[in-house]
């Protein structure tokens, strides 16, 4: 049997010791499977994604991502796992304001040999290809700092950054919230 992409058992998480916002008895997501989380604001969706991404640490339970039990990893090891295996689109895009559009998209490759090898020799060309698939093709725009872009354009840059290097799991927290319907 193939190891699941994500496996959760007895997960509990609370902010600063308050009432738990997450209480997940059991959950498994198979490799290749897609999942859409739906719920009202404040229901814990972003918190759950943060725990799965290893940005937040569960108070109790077991969270495994691609066979790695996150609770047993140091902060640096969780960062390495995330850099090598996860593409993440955060609600607050976390783009580096002084980098160009292409520089922001290729940034994950500076932290992951694995993703850099997958992209191969021309990271800028791969960034442009991904940006083009997301509707950003103007070369002058791609050379600009991301802080000069519209919020919708910034969200497209964040999506391309999450996808570069073919991560095994993409975690997207409201990835289309700033995009127009086209």
Model-found features: residue ranges?
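Catalytic Walker B motif of ABC-type/P-loop ATPase nucleotide-binding domains
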Residues: 170-173
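ABC ATPase NBD coupling module
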Residues: 70-87
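Conserved ABC transporter NBD signature motif
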Residues: 61-69
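Short coil-to-helix segment of the ABC ATPase nucleotide-binding domain corresponding to the Q-loop/switch region
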Residues: 99-108
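Conserved ABC ATPase signature
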Residues: 145-149, 153
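Helix-to-loop junction immediately C-terminal to a conserved catalytic motif
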Residues: 53
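Conserved catalytic motifs of ABC-family nucleotide-binding domains
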Residues: 166
């Amino acid at each position: 049997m193939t190891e699941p992409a994500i496996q959760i058992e007895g997960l509990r998480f609370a902010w600063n010791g308050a009432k738990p916002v997450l209480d997940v008895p059991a959950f498994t997501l198979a490799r290749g499977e897609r999942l859409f989380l739906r719920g009202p604001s404040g229901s814990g969706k972003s918190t759950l994604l943060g725990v799965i991404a290893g940005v937040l640490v569960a108070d109790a339970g077991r969270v495994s991502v691609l066979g790695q039990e996150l609770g047993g990893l140091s902060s640096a090891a969780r960062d390495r796992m995330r850099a090598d295996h996860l593409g993440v689109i955060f609600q607050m895009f976390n783009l580096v304001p002084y980098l160009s559009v292409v520089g922001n998209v290729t940034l994950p490759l500076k932290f992951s040999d694995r993703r850099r090898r997958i992209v191969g020799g021309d990271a800028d060309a791969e960034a442009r290809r991904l940006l083009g698939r997301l509707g950003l093709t103007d070369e002058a725009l791609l050379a600009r700092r991301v802080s000069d872009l519209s919020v919708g354009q910034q969200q497209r840059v964040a999506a391309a950054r999450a996808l570069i290097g073919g991560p095994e799991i993409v975690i997207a927290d409201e990835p289309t919230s700033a995009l127009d319907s086209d």
